Amino acid sequence: MNLIYNFSAGPAMIPRDVLNQAKKELHNWKNLGSSIMEISHRSEEFIQMALEAEKDLRDLLKIPDSFKVLFCQGGARGQFSAIPMNLLNNLQTADYINSGYWSNSAFMEAKKYCTPRSIFIRETNGVKESLLPMHKWNINENSAYIHYCPNETIDGLSIYEEPVFENKIVVGDFSSFILSRSINIKNYDLIYAGAQKNIGPAGITIIIIRKNIIGYSSKMTPSILDYKKISDHHSMFNTPPTFAWYLSGLVFKWLKKQGGLKAIEKLNKKKSDLLYKKIDNSDFYINKINSKHRSQMNVVFHLVNPKLNYIFLKEASKTGLNYLRGHSIVGGMRASLYNAMPLEGVESLVKFMSYFEKRYG
């Protein structure tokens, strides 16, 4: 079978080694004669797996004991509601840094629970879009917390600065950013991430939260979204998505085998640099993002002649390059280069882009 490269923004590629291991263990996990999907989440074997997964994640991100790691459900959109219900702590406002679709979606959901402020940080210099540096964010001293999204998957924008805001709770939507590079977890109070991009399959959401901000949920908070309830029950207040948890744990082990986040960060930069170089050296393809804020995870680009979009996608798919269509909001193309995307996949895409430009340019 010809190699297929999946450039989907999510659900996204899972490392081939991980899929092969899951396939091998599917019918008989740990010699139990059953799949992990069939055994109790309260069994000794599952609990051991869950503890290992948390330990491996802590090792990768260097998470100190002052933080809890929660494995939840509901995706990032569930957290859009959970965050204000857990963190407002009787205050009436929070600051939402608006850098694109997902950060704005979090802001819109927060309006159900408080009067949040949207701080728009995008600006256009000529034809290139940029983002205001953090020291220019107009933070409200009375806000309960600051929420931002370091990587906007639809727009292909990233914030690489790490936040340093004194006496402020900092919340980050890391759904498409987590485990792609090293971060200083101590600069945050809560980060959350849907798994379906850099962690594993859809269905599980990871929350890393400073212990001292747990326990202040409003009375209206559903138990399934209450961080203290989830924490007290070791992420098993209800039956968790067991297979997604297991597969995420395999991905954590795979990442450690690759050399950890320093090695992954280096590879991710190499992949995105290769693709951006092709775009920048061409009059046939366009990227509209300032180089300082280009996403390494989601490379968005357009063809100068949009009439060729359909042909580009059709021919790319024939060569094993799938799911390159850009989001309907921005159009064009989007190549998602998450951790599981090998360098060879990006090289194949660049080679195809050169062929397509030569043929239709």
UniProtKB/Swiss-Prot annotation:
Post-translational modification N6-(pyridoxal phosphate)lysine, affected residues: 197
GO cellular component: cytoplasm
GO biological process, one term: L-serine biosynthetic process
Protein's cellular compartments: Cytoplasm
Protein name from the UniProt record: Phosphoserine aminotransferase
Swiss-Prot/TrEMBL cofactor(s): pyridoxal 5'-phosphate
Name of encoding gene: serC
Family from the record: Belongs to the class-V pyridoxal-phosphate-dependent aminotransferase family. SerC subfamily.
